């Protein structure tokens, strides 16, 4: 029997994990090893994927992946209320630098003591969703985005530790192992192996050590000074649990520091320990996790013997490749292709290695990958029994279960999602955002009038006066007025992500996205795309399949980004009754989604044939969004928007004003029609004539929109003499709608195109995106225009 055949709330023990390649290895690294108990907790509303509980955490996977896992001993797990546990906290933490054990640590120092002031580099590594980015912000004072979705960090970020100018810490993407399953794991592994930081700060979720310590054991094999940060200790204590810090430290052989990154508890102590082990080169005192001498079975002894034999055999090749010997030995046994390639063992050693592995598999009754995973999790289980007093079911988990009954329920999940998105759109475009934008517009107009009056009083040159007021002020002001709308949208997106709801959306929508060749994890980058395409495209790095990643990147520009909101708001307010404005706005977003689906179906049958990536994802508990995190994100987005307004849009506004007011001989133009801008616009205008808006001013605005979508509004404002309300002289309600459709679908901005070039690895891909998006936009707009003309709307 396999896991896909389990009934709701049934439990079973894993008998065997079938399959091949990186997926199977990833499942083993997630703790799905032989003999592990699993419970089917939930089935997605559409029947697939499923959510299981394993080793104290929630994991989602599709029925296709679940069918690879053989199970036995099906039963109903007895849920017994836990009594109040005995707390083991006689000493919160041992002495500085483990002074009580300093002799044993310093005996393992691998390098001379670094002088004070010498640069120290740290790698901040940990599982996804363990509070890593929060800790990075506490260490450095940086403002990285903190979310409650697996994979918030999609690139390495560097920062200097506060009060320690010599210490630099790098926030690496969250990973579950050092095996190359996803691009984020590759980024982390390459940094650790190639750049060789002075030390590692390994952050783990203290409420689920069993899952987190698998990565810890692999990091310890790198032979780099390391400290373990036990995060979320406040939650462990509040739920009635505790951890024997001293015992944990003794069994692991590395310093262990209890912290709460969210509450800034224990951070100073963590920094002191990290700098101490890095300066003194104190590497982990234990890298053997095979307790063959502790009465725990001959099979573990077989793993122990195999690892040591392989390590001895490949020592020369590992040293030549500048790689840790123990790490190479375990990775070779796990069939790690990059390590195999780097070591390039000679034929006689390869033959001896295969012989050692065959002995291992015979003695353990497991294949080589299972044997290593089994060794790790046996050690982790033994360690947790001795050091962890398990708490009651956490308040966070209870709350999550109750909320999920509604938000991921069979009949309520999709209605709830639609209702939530409807509220977001209503608040952003009709109520809160629109009201704040009106207030902002009044303020901006007041500032422009003051500047105008001041320049008049000072009798400034009329040309300069016109450039400042009509060019700069009106151009920038027209965009700044929409800042509240954009901030409101990011506020709601941030709350959805920080709370953990986006992970549930991925779970609910997976089966739907699979029909267009993607997985549920692709839904989150596309949802982020409604805010900004750049972070959305970068967040595709959390996808383990190159096919899915590239396909998601190509679909993300169809999700209307917030930079287009000023265009929509301007035209919708000018041409549509207030009661229908939210409907028109929603219709534009839905059209973008429909076009993305159509494009995905074409890509699935042509360029990206094949199956979508397996959907294996941890579901975090719901958390109340941190007000500090939300405010930080909003501030960053507002600051970025204003910076763009005073850089790109400033330059664009001045340039547009200059081209509009001077002719080709650089004389003041007698009229706008004689200007250089009219000449340039008239060259492009015929392309848009079949769409119903052949005016050169419109084509000019679309061209400037390539630099930044907000520039479309600022350009139109400048060309209309500083009065955007005159836009009804350029459009009818019907042609305004065609223009909106075109701006919805045409090329993303330069920043997004640059990101696409970086992520897809070439200029050709970026050029192709520009051409294809413009072609799709033109064809859809042309089709709608022709249909509307036939219907008499023109």
Question: Which ranges hold each PLM region?
Answer:
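Core alpha-helical transmembrane segments of integral membrane proteins
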Residues: 407-507
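Extended, low-charge hydrophobic alpha-helical regions
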Residues: 363, 370-374, 390, 431-472, ...
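Transmembrane helix-loop junctions at the membrane interface of multipass transporters and ion channels
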Residues: 562-586, 751-762, 783-794
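Alpha-helical transmembrane helix bundles of large polytopic membrane transport and channel proteins
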Residues: 227, 237-392
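Conserved G1/Walker A P-loop phosphate-binding module
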Residues: 95-177
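Hydrophobic core segments of alpha-helical transmembrane domains in multi-pass membrane transport
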Residues: 416-427, 489-494, 572-575, 589-602, ...
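Conserved C-terminal guanine-recognition region of P-loop GTPase G domains, centered on the G4
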Residues: 164, 187-256, 567, 574
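Juxtamembrane inter-helical linkers in multi-pass membrane proteins
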Residues: 442, 446-450, 503-533, 609-633, ...
